[in-house]
Amino acid sequence: EDNGQAIYKMVLDYGNVKVSGVDKDTYTVHAKTSTEGKRPADETAYGDKDQDRTIVRVEEKGTKVEIYFDENDGAAGTLSYLATGARNIPVDIEYTVTQNTPVKVSAMDGTDLGEDTFVYSCTNTVEDEETAKFTSVKVDNGINYQYYDAGDADSLIVWFHGNGEGDYKGSQNNVAQLLANRGTVAWATDEAQEIFGKAHVMSFQAPDTWYYAQKDGLLEKAYNEIQEVISKKGIDPKKVYVSGCSAGGYMTTRMLIKYPNLFKAAM
């Protein structure tokens, strides 16, 4: 099962004191995820949520407490799928933490400081080691893409996403193809990199849809941007691979027809 990026953990940082005596009932964590202002007001957005997260366990880590959530509680996602727009778009995330019962507090030297109740503020910043490997590249009058730099590797993998990850109304979010499923991040895993002997990764985001690639000149734009990366990164032109799913499979096929000598293999 691949439901895309999901928030499964929150870290509470208590600064210069240690806390203990916490359990999953100590806190209530409320999640609000919204695409308001990014879509028509009457558009149904299935990932817009306003609910408490289901806490499955907590772990005490000295001055920090880690709260783990049920990834299937309905509010874990960082994208929202639009019913008629047929696109996944990034949500604005707002988490609120309420402490229900006092926690035991001690100084760094172990001195007992009694019990206390804290007020919490959230950064609402998602940290993801897999997506952090990629850099957003935006191209004027071209096709935006996410890029994984594999250092001195001389191979390149090109990925074309499915229709739900295309851009929405010119927002140029350039992240839906990174977050909606593992189609992009999988190529940068240790396992995939070992198989390919290290390879750079380009994950394009369609300005709208791949289905109009010929009419919209996307084949030529993708080709030119691939050639630019080949030249800039010193990639062996005989070690360029391509893959895609759904609408991205269509785009992959169109690229193979138009540029039959560009790719070593297609998947």
Kindly give the residue locations of the regions a language model identified.
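Active-site machinery of serine-nucleophile hydrolases
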Residues: 154-156, 160-221
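Gly/Ser-rich "nucleophile elbow"/oxyanion-hole loop immediately N-terminal to the catalytic nucleophile
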Residues: 210-246, 262
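A conserved short beta-strand
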Residues: 261-267
